[in-house]
Amino acid sequence: MLFRSDWQDLAAEYTKETGVPVTVVTAASGQYETTLMSEMEKSEAPTLFQVNGPVGLANWKDYCYDLSGSQLYGELTSDSFALKDGDAVAAIAYVIETYGIIYNKELLTAAGYTQDDIKGFDDLKKVADDIQARKAELGVDGAFTSAGMDGSSDWRFKTHLANLPIYYEYKADGIGSTDAIKGTYLDNYKQIWDLYITDSTCDPKLLASKTGNDAVAEFTGKKAVFYQNGTWAYGDVSSLGDDNLGMLPIYIGVEGEENQGLCTGSENFWCVNNAASEADIQATLDFLYWCVTSDKGTSAMADDMGFVIPFKAAKDSTNPLIGIANQYVADGKTSVDWCFSTMPSEEWKNGVGSALTAYAAGTGDWDGVVTAFVDGWAKEYKLANG
């Protein structure tokens, strides 16, 4: 977990205040589910664990204590931040994050544009194409940072970018999940991916080995104007200066997208183990309540972890990207939901990622992406749900 030491510090602070010991167990990157399975089999299983959304909850709902009567649930600012299993509140989101296209204001201005010039995909393409054509004159290597497809970066495209066509399909069909994605908006997915890999700092054939750190270095080194990432990346890009950072929605060319905002949601939901003793369940609920209501807890989550938490006592974050995200909402823009928690499996994401990489390298075609997206979804959903 990214914030392991922060959570351990917070747990130690709680123990100091209350005398109640709190042990924090963390997992290696990408190993949370495996670690949780082995921990839950122990005689002293964790009393608190997390799921990433509806798909994660499906695996663990039988272990989830109903939080509907808890003080913690009463502190939520909106019921939409709770995951339900029937009438029971099985899980509660504890951090809300936002992503889009972060941009360097200074470089965009030097190219002769402002955010007001970009209200949809056609505008974004026009501006990016122009920057790419004038890259030598502007002193950049490309409009967009490299869309690295190694394990440190591919989630930005096989998951976060893939969220857009899923969101619009769900919206058009009036659904919140599906056993068979139709791929209605995959042409839109193609055109934004084409833009990312064409108006880029590097040859698309090199993307398989490009990393998340490469993209950060290009962006902070002022070699690219646009960088797809989220509020959590502020620490990586803060050297450019707060006033120099802007954020655009990820436009994919859908009707009405001038009213689209940034992508906002959560992949982090707290669950309390219903197999724990009543005393341990209450102790866990007391700790969580303290985290989201006490000055020490809310300060640690806002300042040390940089979180926006969906609870009434939340402190304002000093992260300027969060301020930008809040402004989109205040301006009446419609936030794009995080639908990727309904993606059928990690294997599905990997299949889409491999197909995107092959397409960029010229060793595969777009049909391969469509197959991985649509057929892969039906197959993985069936494997997961029988």
Predicted regions and their residues:
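Glycine-centered hinge/linker elements that transmit conformational signals in sensory
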Residues: 128-129, 175-208
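Extracytoplasmic/periplasmic substrate-recognition and gating elements
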Residues: 111, 239-304
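Conserved C-terminal helix/tail region of periplasmic/extracytoplasmic solute-binding proteins
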Residues: 109, 133, 298, 315-317, ...
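Hinge/lid segment of periplasmic solute-binding proteins
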Residues: 52-103, 156, 160-162, 246-248
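Short, solvent-exposed loop/beta-turn-alpha elements that line the ligand-binding surface or hinge
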Residues: 66-80, 142-144, 148-151, 165-191, ...
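A structural signal for short loop-to-beta-strand junctions that line the ligand-binding cleft
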Residues: 39, 46-47, 73-108, 142, ...
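Conserved N-terminal structural module of periplasmic/extracytoplasmic solute-binding proteins
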Residues: 1-56, 208, 254-257, 279-283, ...
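Extracytoplasmic/periplasmic solute-binding protein
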Residues: 90-94, 99, 125-178, 224
